[in-house]
Structures are given as structure tokens and as C-alpha cells.
């Protein structure tokens, strides 16, 4: 099933998707999603964060897990249907605010610069201009020592502009140009995860990160993850 509701801008109609199924990716039940959330949590460098922005919250399952380690979270999504579902899911979590805000739009509701930004399985649904604007937006609004978590399903999702691998490698390069280094890398046959920060030690485990000695090799094709 194709989900483009505007062939000119090629924007997926996620509201229609959620209307057919309130959990179309089985986020609340699938092992892939539960495992991914656990790995995201394990990859966070700090035990607690002051302020977070989840820039594609979906139905709010990851936000619910993050809420145990963040003082205040703004969760946004491009789909009004997803926002409604997430609002219900997170109703008993008073330090979480859910709002409609599509990338690369600057979100309202950020009381302070977030020290954690999460962009999970969103980038490949944006066109090239919107992806570039998203990288610039994150660089602009994140706190100086913020952590940015990027997660992409590795293959090419239906109705996506690029594959997860392509989006991840593009984002890594764009962030590096802005002074963000990768401090955590996870790559397997299902998804890619990276934690990026401008607060990167010059020497990590004997590697000179300041001079580009990066031992964290990411696959350049899906076959490399097998």
C-alpha cells in the first residue's frame, strides 16, 4: 500500500495509516521495538537528562521509557493521529508534553535547550532539503553538551525517500561538519543507532577522536551487517 497523499511533495499520509491501525508498526508489542528501545536506553551516556525532545514520537512508547530518565520531555510528531494516541498513552506522565510539529519545523514548547534529542526512524521519510534543515535545526537548538540519538531501520522502508543506511551516513557526515562526534555506535541486521555530541573527549580508549581516528566502522551496505 502506498501512503503518499501529495505526489508533488511526496509526504506519507501517516494519519491515514494510523486510522487503519492505531499501532501500525506494533511498537507496543513487537520484539524488534522492545529490543530497540532497550538498546536506546542502554546507549544513553548519562543516568539522567534535564530536558529532551523526541522529534518523531509516534504513539509514545519510547517517550514513556525515556520519561524515567528525563526531567522534562517534549514529544512531537508530524501525524495528528499519532499525537492524539501519544497524548492518551502518556496522560499519566505529567512531565511529558505532546505536540503536533513536523520536521524540520522548530517546535513550540521547549522551555530550555534540550540536552537530549532523539530522532528515531524519521529521517528517511523526509526529502533531502528537509533532512538538511533538520540537521541544522538540531544543531541550533540543542544545548552545547547535548546528546543526539539517531535511530534508523537499515533497509529502505516503503514510501521513504532513502534507505535507513543512506540517511544515517548522510546525517553522520552533516553532523561532523557542525562539530558533532559519534560517541556510541550500534549496527546490526535490523537497525543502526548512533549517539552524537559536541562534547566528545579528545581521547577515548586510546583513540584520538579529535584527529578523526574513528574505530567505529559503520557498514556501507546492508550486506555488511549480515
Where are these regions (language model features)?
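A conserved beta-strand element that flanks and buttresses the S-adenosyl-L-methionine
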Residues: 118
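Class I (Rossmann-like) S-adenosyl-L-methionine-dependent methyltransferase catalytic domain
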Residues: 1-55, 59-110, 126-140, 146-226
Amino acid at each position: 500500500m502506498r501512503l503518499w497523499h501529495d505526489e508533488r511533495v511526496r509526504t506519507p499520509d501517516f494519519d491515514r495509516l494510523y486510522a487503519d491501525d492505531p499501532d501500525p508498526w506494533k511498537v507496543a508489542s513487537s520484539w524488534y521495538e522492545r529490543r530497540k528501545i532497550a538498546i536506546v536506553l542502554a546507549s544513553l551516556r548519562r543516568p539522567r537528562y534535564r530536558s529532551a525532545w523526541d522529534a518523531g514520537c509516534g504513539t509514545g512508547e519510547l517517550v514513556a521509557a525515556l520519561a524515567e530518565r528525563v526531567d522534562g520531555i517534549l514529544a512531537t510528531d508530524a501525524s495528528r493521529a499519532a499525537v492524539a494516541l501519544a497524548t492518551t498513552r502518556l496522560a499519566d506522565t505529567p512531565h511529558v508534553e505532546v505536540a503536533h510539529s513536523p520536521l524540520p519545523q522548530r517546535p513550540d514548547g521547549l522551555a530550555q535547550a534540550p540536552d537530549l534529542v532523539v530522532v528515531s526512524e524519521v529521517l528517511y521519510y523526509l526529502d533531502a532539503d528537509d533532512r538538511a534543515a533538520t540537521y541544522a535545526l538540531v544543531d541550533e537548538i540543542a544545548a552545547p553538551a547535548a546528546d543526539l540519538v539517531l535511530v534508523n531501520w537499515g533497509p529502505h522502508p516503503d514510501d521513504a525517500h532513502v534507505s535507513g543506511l543512506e540517511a544515517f551516513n548522510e546525517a553522520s557526515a552533516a553532523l561532523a561538519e557542525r562539530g558533532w562526534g559519534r560517541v556510541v555506535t550500534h549496527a546490526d541486521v535490523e537497525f543502526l543507532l548512533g549517539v552524537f555530541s559536541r562534547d566528545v573527549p579528545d581521547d577515548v580508549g586510546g583513540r584520538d577522536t579529535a584527529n578523526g581516528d574513528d574505530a567505529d566502522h559503520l557498514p556501507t551496505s546492508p550486506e555488511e551487517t549480515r
